[in-house]
């Protein structure tokens, strides 16, 4: 069974607007509406939307029988956001995490991520000519995945990496919940980063698969 968690609690400060960023429009629809369509196209059994900034407006936009909203009262990071919804997921389900302001990822790429998570955890990366602002995918000398480092925590060498973390990942609800409970906030932003679960999966000798998207994220 597939469940989707959509993160929609952000403020959209980079858009210089008081409107929640997921409510900005694309092709006449709020960004989050496009992401909901994607979740339904993937035949998700249940859809969870994590709300925060402008919660009432976002909830009104996403309201539907197949959508359950969860409040992130404090903005403590993406890992903390997922924690607000993971407890409502069936432990045996596969959980796909999407961002409510990233509407243009193809269904095929997301299906690849879900399929790759069968035995462990999978994430979606992309190659950018200008990766500024994104977390970087760190690999060893043999090209094997090591982890994701956020830009504010990255070394100059790591900031030169063009492979970025899109934020999309999938894993079983049971494993994801356990890893989230181990994530700490010892980083430059004092936040609980969702990508830290990838490193915890490696520590547990669980397979980590990186699916590289053909989408243009520039």
Short names for language-model regions:
Residues 29-112:
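Conserved N-terminal catalytic core of the sugar/cofactor nucleotidyltransferase
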Residues 128, 134-147:
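Acceptor/aglycone-binding surface of glycosyltransferases and processive sugar-polymer synthases
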Residues 145-218:
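Catalytic-core segments of class I nucleotidyltransferases/pyrophosphorylases
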Residues 19-25, 183-186:
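Short glycine-enriched, charge-decorated loop/helix-capping segments at active-site entrances
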